[in-house]
C-alpha cells in the first residue's frame, strides 16, 4: 500500500485556500491549484473527485458542536413561547448571537469561504437549505405564539435575511477580528431592541 504524502496534501490545501479566497468557487481553477502545489491536475484528481470535494474539504466547522449549542437555544425559544416571556426570548437571541460570533472568530477564513466564496458549489446549496429551514422554523415559532392577527409574517423572513446579509458584509469587507467584535456589540443593541419590540407586538391582542 502506498504511504499517503501528507506534505503534498498540505501544499494542495494551501494552494486551494489561496485560489478559492481570491477567485471564489466558480472562478477558481483546479489547474492553477495543482500548479501552485507543484503537481499535475491528474495527480490532484487522485486525491479529490473534483472542485466541489476540494472546496468542501477546506471548511471544517465544528457542525456537531454548533448543532448541540443551537439545540440549547431552541429550548429557550420554546420556553419563551410557552411562557410568553420576552426576557427568555432575548436570552435565546443572545446565546444564538454568541454562537455565530464565536464561529466567526474561531473559523474566520472558513466563514469567508462559506458565506462569500461558495457561489455555484454544493456547499452553497447546503447552506441555502439550512437558511430556508431556519426561516421556516422561525416563522412557525412566531405564528404559533402570535395573538396579533394582523401581523405580516413575511416581515420575519425579510428581517432574518437582512441579519444574514449583515454577517456576510462583515466578512466581505475583511475587517479585523477586533473590529468585528466592536461592530457586533453595536449590532446586538439594535437587534435585541428590535426583536423585543416585535415580540411584544405579537403577544398583544
Predicted regions and their residues:
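N-terminal intrinsically disordered/low-complexity leader segments
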Residues: 1-4, 203-204
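C-terminal/domain-terminus segments
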Residues: 2, 17, 111-131, 187-194
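Helix-turn-helix
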Residues: 11, 15, 19-53, 57
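Short, basic, alpha-helical segments at the C-terminal edge of helix-turn-helix-like DNA-binding modules
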Residues: 30, 59-74
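Hydrophobic alpha-helical connector segments
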Residues: 57, 72-105
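Hydrophobic/aromatic residues within well-ordered alpha-helical segments
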Residues: 58, 62-66, 93-96, 100, ...
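Amphipathic alpha-helical packing segments from all-alpha helical-bundle domains
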Residues: 99-106, 119-146, 154-164
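Hydrophobic/aromatic-rich alpha-helical bundle segments in the mid-to-C-terminal region
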Residues: 113, 141-191, 198-205
Amino acid at each position: 500500500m502506498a504511504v499517503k504524502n501528507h506534505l503534498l496534501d498540505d501544499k494542495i490545501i494551501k494552494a486551494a485556500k489561496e485560489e478559492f479566497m481570491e477567485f471564489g468557487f466558480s472562478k477558481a481553477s483546479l489547474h492553477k491549484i495543482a500548479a501552485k502545489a507543484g503537481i499535475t491536475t491528474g495527480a490532484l484528481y487522485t486525491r479529490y473527485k473534483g472542485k466541489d470535494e476540494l472546496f468542501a474539504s477546506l471548511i471544517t466547522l465544528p457542525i456537531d458542536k454548533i448543532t448541540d449549542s443551537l439545540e440549547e437555544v431552541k429550548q429557550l425559544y420554546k420556553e419563551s413561547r410557552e411562557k410568553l416571556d420576552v426576557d427568555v426570548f432575548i436570552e435565546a437571541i443572545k446565546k444564538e448571537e454568541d454562537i455565530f460570533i464565536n464561529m466567526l472568530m474561531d473559523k474566520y477564513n472558513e466563514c469567508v469561504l462559506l458565506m462569500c466564496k461558495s457561489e455555484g458549489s454544493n456547499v452553497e446549496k447546503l447552506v441555502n437549505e439550512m437558511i430556508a429551514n431556519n426561516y421556516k422554523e422561525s416563522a412557525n415559532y412566531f405564528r404559533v405564539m402570535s395573538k396579533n392577527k394582523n401581523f405580516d409574517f413575511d416581515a420575519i423572513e425579510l428581517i432574518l435575511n437582512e441579519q444574514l446579509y449583515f454577517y456576510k458584509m462583515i466578512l466581505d469587507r475583511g475587517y479585523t477580528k477586533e473590529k468585528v467584535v466592536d461592530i457586533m456589540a453595536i449590532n446586538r443593541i439594535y437587534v435585541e431592541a428590535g426583536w423585543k419590540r416585535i415580540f411584544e407586538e405579537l403577544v398583544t391582542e
